[in-house]
């Protein structure tokens, strides 16, 4: 018997390309449903399952996303069986409430990550300059040692 479930995914799952990944996994497993960002910061999936093993594989595949993508952080997946069956078109489809608003949020998130990358690059630049200074000092000392050895020979 086909049952409709709601899966609620908590964590850093919005504006990081998560729903696209869900669509891909769902289609690969032959699951029908929808995925959308909820205003509380979660991602929600409404999907039909007629096989418990497929549902568990779907959830495990979702959880595994955070290992492949450092932007995604899944805290927990909550599962609710719905009392009503909802018929969905084949595959998992993404629902967007406002594509422009969504795009702006993703751009804002992207800017945060770019700033983080630049700040880390500055730190790495300082470290590399320190290493360079140390190497220059080491070369000077080695040259002095070389000169002393040449004088003794």
UniProtKB/Swiss-Prot annotation:
InterPro entries the record matches: Acylphosphatase, Acylphosphatase-like_dom, Acylphosphatase-like_dom_sf, Acylphosphatase_CS
Residues making up the signal peptide according to the UniProt record: none
Pfam families named in the record: Acylphosphatase
A Gene Ontology molecular function term of the record: acylphosphatase activity
Domain (Acylphosphatase-like) ranges: 4-102
SS bond partners: none
PANTHER family linked: ACYLPHOSPHATASE
Protein name: Acylphosphatase-like protein MJ0553
Organism of derivation: Methanocaldococcus jannaschii (strain ATCC 43067 / DSM 2661 / JAL-1 / JCM 10045 / NBRC 100440) (Methanococcus jannaschii)
